Amino acid sequence: MIGYLNLVYAGLHEPPSSWTIIPPDFTISRHVEVLLSVDSTIYIVDNLENIDQRISRGPFTHLAASPNGKGLALLSYSGLLWVVSTDFQRSLAEFNTKEVVGVDGPVRQIQWCANDAVIVSWDGLVLLVGPFGDTLQSVLFIAHFVRGLKLSYRYFYSGSTFAITELDGVRIIGPDVCDFVQKVPGTYHRR
């Protein structure tokens, strides 16, 4: 017999455009919560109830929960990256991905870089969006990020990438490299 999670029926008549999971350790209900992008809103579904968050900013092509379960990154069909608290009460950052010069094709992936920033990736380009919408574009090397400055460096990978969120950063795997991006530790800021 195959085990499965019994979720409350969310009233879906078609598949969600995107979804993500928040583990039970990070939810008030202490149940696994699945966030579903349906039409212009987000449903939070667990094994007891489903709650329409009544958000009118969707639909969203990509959803990603931060490793600590406190933040969400949502990418709309219009290309707006919206970073918000998981209770949808605090907007942390907004960034229009359509304004990135040199991007070819749709966004392939969004992932968190620890709990501090979000990675947006296209074929051959990775963009790091910081807590206030600051950006750092990279491929092979991530420069020292100084708080308060808007940095924009452009480096390209030789092909598609895949990003994996980790507790202290994000691993970016390309055709010929594996990079690890993390926040510069506080001890380096004082030098």
Describe the residue ranges of each PLM region:
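Intrinsically disordered, low-complexity regions in large eukaryotic scaffold subunits
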Residues: I2-R191
